[in-house]
């Protein structure tokens, strides 16, 4: 029988795949989409911040340039050796610085003069040199340097968006940075992974403003999110597997019940009708199984009954074919004895009546071996009357063997065959030996008659396999066919014979079925 995988397992896998895999795909697609949207938003934000910062710095630069242009003539009338003019110059520059949103420091240097608003003496090397201008004063020409320490917009971008600003020259030397990871004066080397940046030109000196974002921090947050989602996914997998298994059990319970009923029906142990727990179209199959089982049982019982009747008919037919020639000969003997010896004729009639009563008994096809032997003794006694006591019957049997049950008329044909075909001498000795071995009764019938030639022996052996109704030789053929009907192929009959040396018939009868009325 082919081994099948339970349908419940296949359904469980299908349910599991149809629930967990879509969730897994949704999570993956969601993560990829989230990452793509995040990158897009960050790029857009950086672009916006670059534009805003560029505009703010250009506005500051324009205001400074406008201030210097407007006050250029005024500066030429001031003498920075004069204390009053120095104060006026400081006041004007401070006004310019305070009007700008950026944190600016100026340095005005000339011959023996240095003016600045860097009262805290901050290191201007860490500041961006925003612009330089030459200013002509009355006493001399001075150099004005304006440094940018920070701008509110860049600080706001750094605080709110974690985006940092760099200003580099045309050789990528860092001129300004509000991130401690970069040092002013070093080369700017953009990272290949984990950074997003955008740059824009600031001035004619090819200085560039770079706004960049370090996404490693977000990646760490993303990893944490991934771990959380992985845990959730594992829990979903476990929950999905348990749910799929329970659902598969519920959905296939009726199918498994039907399969079990089919198995019981094959072994003829189905029992009475029981409906399925769930009212579904499977109930049609359930009803059909019971209807088919009942029809099959009725058919089996009908076949068994027909076979029993056929065996009974065959057995009766065989038993009837044993009788005619014997009855005819016996009746002639009785007719002869009535005149010569009425008393002996009466004895023969009594023996014949007992034999007929035995052979015509219809309530059972099995008898004790002892009854069969009594029948044989009566049969031989009648035959001895016909043949002047020339037949000597010897029975060798244990008491246990005599009480075994065998089919009726299973031994008589052997004696009949010995008398019919072995009688050609003044005396015919027939020996019946009965032994028990391995649940079998072994019967040996030996006579000292004329025996058979090799060709005749071969013919008799072959005739045993002919159909009982197709042969004219009824003796051993009838017995063999009767044994095959009653005991099956377990019964064995072997014939051995030599010309003028007698005949030996070995017969094995299974006792395991002997007690059954077949």
Curated annotation (Swiss-Prot):
What's the Enzyme Commission number for this chain? Answer: 2.7.13.3
Highest taxon in the source lineage: Bacteria
Q: Which GO terms describe its cellular component?
A: plasma membrane
One GO MF annotation is: phosphorelay sensor kinase activity
Q: How is it modified after translation?
A: Autophosphorylated.
Query: Per its UniProt record, what Pfam families does this chain match?
Result: HATPase_c, His_kinase
Q: Give the location in the cell.
A: Cell membrane
Residue ranges occupied by any Histidine kinase domain in the UniProt entry:
297-513
The protein's topology relative to the membrane is:
Multi-pass membrane protein
Q: Give the chief site where it resides.
A: membrane
Phosphohistidine modification sites are: 325
> Which transformation does this protein catalyse, written as a reaction?
ATP + protein L-histidine = ADP + protein N-phospho-L-histidine
| Spans traversing the lipid bilayer | 20-40, 222-242
Q: Chaperone: is it a keyword of this entry?
A: no
Sorted alphabetically, which Gene3D superfamilies does this protein's record hold?
A: Histidine kinase-like ATPase, C-terminal domain (3.30.565.10)
- What role does this protein play? Member of the two-component regulatory system HptS/HptR that regulates genes involved in hexose phosphate transport system in response to changes in extracellular phosphate sources. May act as a sensor protein kinase which is autophosphorylated at a histidine residue and transfers its phosphate group to the conserved aspartic acid residue in the regulatory domain of HptS. In turn, HptS antagonizes CcpA-dependent transcription of a subset of CcpA-regulated genes involved in antibiotic susceptibility.
Any idea what this protein is called?
Answer: Sensor protein kinase HptS
User: Native species of this protein?
Assistant: Staphylococcus aureus (strain MSSA476)
Gene (UniProt): hptS
């Amino acid at each position: 029988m082919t081994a099948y995988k339970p349908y419940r397992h296949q359904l469980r896998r299908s349910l599991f795949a149809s629930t967990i895999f879509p969730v897994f795909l949704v999570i993956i697609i969601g993560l990829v989409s989230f990452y793509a949207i995040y990158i897009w938003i960050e790029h857009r934000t950086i672009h916006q911040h670059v534009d805003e910062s560029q505009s703010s710095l250009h506005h500051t630069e324009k205001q400074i340039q406008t201030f210097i242009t407007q006050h250029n003539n005024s500066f030429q009338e001031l003498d920075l050796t004069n204390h009053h003019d120095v104060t006026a110059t400081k006041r004007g520059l401070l006004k310019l610085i305070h009007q700008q949103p950026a944190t600016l420091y100026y340095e005005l240097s000339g011959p023996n003069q240095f003016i600045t608003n860097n009262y805290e003496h901050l290191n201007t090397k860490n500041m961006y040199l925003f612009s330089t201008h030459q200013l002509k004063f009355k006493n001399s020409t001075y150099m004005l340097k304006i440094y940018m320490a920070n701008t509110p917009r860049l600080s706001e971008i750094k605080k709110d968006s974690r985006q940092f600003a760099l200003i580099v020259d045309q050789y990528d030397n860092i001129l300004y940075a509000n991130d401690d990871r970069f040092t002013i004066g070093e080369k700017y080397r953009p990272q290949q992974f984990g950074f997003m940046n955008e740059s824009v030109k600031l001035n004619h000196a090819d200085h560039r403003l770079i706004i960049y974002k370090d996404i490693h921090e977000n990646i760490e947050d993303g990893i944490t999110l991934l771990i959380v989602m992985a845990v959730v996914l594992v829990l979903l997998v476990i929950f999905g597997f348990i749910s799929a298994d329970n659902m598969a059990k519920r959905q296939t319970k009726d199918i498994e019940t039907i399969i079990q009923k089919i198995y019981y029906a094959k072994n003829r142990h189905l029992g009475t009708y029981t409906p399925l727990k769930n009212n579904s179209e499977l109930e049609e199959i359930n009803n059909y199984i019971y209807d088919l089982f009942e029809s099959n049982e009725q058919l089996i019982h009908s076949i068994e009954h027909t076979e029993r009747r056929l065996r009974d008919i065959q057995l009766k037919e065989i038993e009837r074919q044993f009788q005619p020639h014997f009855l005819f000969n016996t009746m002639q003997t009785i007719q002869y004895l009535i005149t010569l010896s009425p008393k002996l004729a009466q004895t023969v009639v009594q023996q014949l009546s007992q034999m007929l009563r035995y052979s015509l008994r219809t309530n059972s096809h099995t008898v004790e071996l002892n009854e069969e032997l009594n029948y044989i003794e009566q049969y031989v006694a009648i035959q001895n009357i016909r043949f002047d006591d020339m037949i000597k019957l010897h029975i060798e049997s244990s008491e246990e063997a005599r009480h075994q049950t065998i089919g009726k008329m299973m031994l008589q044909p052997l004696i009949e065959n010995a008398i019919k075909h072995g009688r050609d001498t003044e005396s015919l000795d027939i020996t019946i030996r009965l032994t028990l071995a391995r649940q079998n009764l072994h019967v040996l019938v030996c006579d000292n008659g004329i025996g058979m030639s090799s060709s005749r022996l071969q013919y008799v052996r072959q005739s045993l396999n002919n159909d009982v109704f197709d042969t004219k030789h009824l003796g051993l053929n009838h017995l063999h066919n009767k044994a095959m009907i009653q005991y099956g192929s377990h019964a064995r009959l072997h014939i051995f014979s030599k010309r003028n040396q007698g005949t030996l018939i070995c017969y094995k009868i299974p006792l395991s079925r002997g007690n059954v009325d077949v």
